[in-house]
Amino acid sequence: ALRKIIGGGEFVGWFQTFVCFVIMVYYGAVLAWGVQYTIYSVNEAWGGDPTSFFLESFLEKVPGNTFSWAPAWSVMIPLALVWVLVLLVIGRGLSKGVEAANKIFLPLLIVLFLALVVRALFLPGAVEGLNAFFTPNWAALADPKVWLAAFAQIFYSLSVGFGIMLTYASYLKPKSNLTGTALVAGFANSSFEILAGIGVFGAVGFMAHQQGVAVAKVEGLTGPILSFVTFPQIISMMPGGPIFGVLFFSSLVLAGVTSLLSLLQVVSGGLQDKFGWSPARSALVFGVPATVISLALFGTRSGLNNLDIVDNFINSIGVVSSAIMFAVLCAVAGPRLGALRAHLNSVSSVKVPKVWEPLVGIVIPLVLFIMMAMSVVDLVTKGYEDYPGGYVMVFGWGAVAIAVIAALIFTFIPWRHRTVDTHATVTQVLADDADAIASTEGDAQ
């Protein structure tokens, strides 16, 4: 799509594609953890020490922040099964695969999660948890890292800035109601996130109540520790814990599967467009190496360490830089934002105001660049957490470098699939819409 608008845009498109590739390679491991913990929830297999069970018995984590090729079979086996499942779905194509799967998984996810939230709200101490959830921490807003993490999270959550929404948008009919659809998607996503927060903090409030401490004193509220240590501990404390556990981890798996399918569709769609391959062939070509890499790096005893580093770098640098390049490309190198806004207003029910242009073309890219630059300087000078420099170089900077190098290679590979040169058509459509809007505004004045 970006290649058709401007020649240099193809690199940005492939960079987004390989950012998705890197994310999906490690994201499958989180799904594998969720699958196993859904089973473990039946009899609360973690016992009285969820931390030791997760790190030692389940992940078989190596001591310290080191690397190991040794497999962790309790992770590797379900991880292999996850990859087989999602590749079979992607191989069936968009309508028979991704769309059909989402018609099952998304309604089921909503039902399970609603049951989970209702259960959490009636736990002792849930109100204290909700008070903590809805009370702003104004001091934290002064930290640029918080804003960068928030941008990366909302980009990932809304699937914007790194290819997913662009891929799905390419399947829309011409003259679709773009802003109306975008508002529905954004509202639905934010509503579900608030619902998730209510459920999580209701459960955390219960845990604080049981321990006789304030919610702020509860440890393990970030990253994998929240889902796989803190929540099992909460599950063990509450009446009907196994039922709550199955609901929670089933919801986690279903949400993860739908996210992983969207990441896979970006890569599959890119290969289909570039080489004219079928969905099945595309799934095989990228699925086999993705599965091998995923098993070799994240199905091992150092899988948690590897995931932690790659996730931090590819989100705070890869996803954010992708969003910056995309915004700049649309604002400067491609069709001007004024013409794009006019086109959006000509086909959509909700009109885009003029302030959208400087926000998307100048303010947001500039703010993102400044925050990302500060984060990069911090990572270069201080490193990441307590990991050795070489470890961070390979899995952190290396993950970003792989996305850049792969994007360059695929940009220069000749297209083997006949494409329609729509640059003139796109430009003309935008120009016509801009003229029509300008004429209408002039008549109104």
Predicted segments — roles?
Residues 27-52, 110-134, 205-206, 293, ...:
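Hydrophobic alpha-helical segments and their helix-loop junctions in multi-pass secondary transporters
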Residues 4, 14-17, 48-91, 159-166, ...:
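Transmembrane alpha-helical segments of multi-pass small-molecule transport proteins
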Residues 1-15, 30-91, 95, 127-148, ...:
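Inter-helical loop and helix-membrane interface segments of multi-pass membrane transporters/permeases
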Residues 1, 80-97, 101, 113, ...:
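Juxtamembrane interface elements at the cytosolic ends of transmembrane helices
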Residues 99, 103-261, 271-285, 289-290, ...:
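Membrane-embedded translocation segments of transport machinery
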Residues 17, 275-287, 314-396:
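C-terminal membrane-solvent junction of multi-pass transporters and transport-like membrane proteins
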Residues 331-354, 382, 389, 394-445:
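Terminal cytosolic tails of multi-pass membrane transporters
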Residues 15-26, 81-88, 148-159, 247-258, ...:
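Hydrophobic alpha-helical transmembrane segments of multi-pass membrane proteins
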